[in-house]
From Swiss-Prot:
Complex formation: Part of the 50S ribosomal subunit; part of the 5S rRNA/L5/L18/L25 subcomplex. Contacts the 5S and 23S rRNAs.
Taxonomic lineage of the native organism: Bacteria, Pseudomonadati, Myxococcota, Myxococcia, Myxococcales
GO biological process, one term: translation
Annotated function: This is one of the proteins that bind and probably mediate the attachment of the 5S RNA into the large ribosomal subunit, where it forms part of the central protuberance.
Organism encoding this protein: Anaeromyxobacter sp. (strain Fw109-5)
A GO MF term: 5S rRNA binding
UniProt keyword Transmembrane present: no
Keywords: Ribonucleoprotein, Ribosomal protein, RNA-binding, rRNA-binding
Family in the record: Belongs to the universal ribosomal protein uL18 family.
NCBIfam families: L18_bact (TIGR00060)
Protein name as it appears in the record: Large ribosomal subunit protein uL18
Amino acid sequence: MAKHVTPREKRRARIRRKISGTAARPRLTIYKSLKHMYAQLVDDTTGTTIVSIATNAKALRDEVKDDDKTAAAKRVGEALAKAAMAKGIEAVVFDRNGFDYHGRVEAVAAAAREAGLKF
C-alpha cells in the first residue's frame, strides 16, 4: 500500500532539493504546529543544528504566554536572530518547510530580518 504524502510534504521535498545551508550561511528552517512555532539554523554540510528556538522553549515560554500566535512567532524570529548574531552568523538561507509564506511564517522571517539577519 502506498504511503500518503501530503501536499506540504511534497513542497517541502521540492524546496529541500534546491537549497542547503553551510557553516557561513546556514539554513533557517521553521516548523509550525497548531500551538507552537519552532525555528532553527542548520549547517547541512555537517548535519548539525547551530541555533534552535521555539515558543515552548524555556527562554521564551514566559514571554509568549499572553501573546497571540503571530506575536509569539515574531518573538521567535527576534530571539533566533539575536542568538545567530551572537554566534557570528549574519546571512541565512530561508527554508519555509513547505508552509505558505503567510501569517506566522512571514512574521518569523520579517522579525529575523528586522533584527539583522540577511536573506
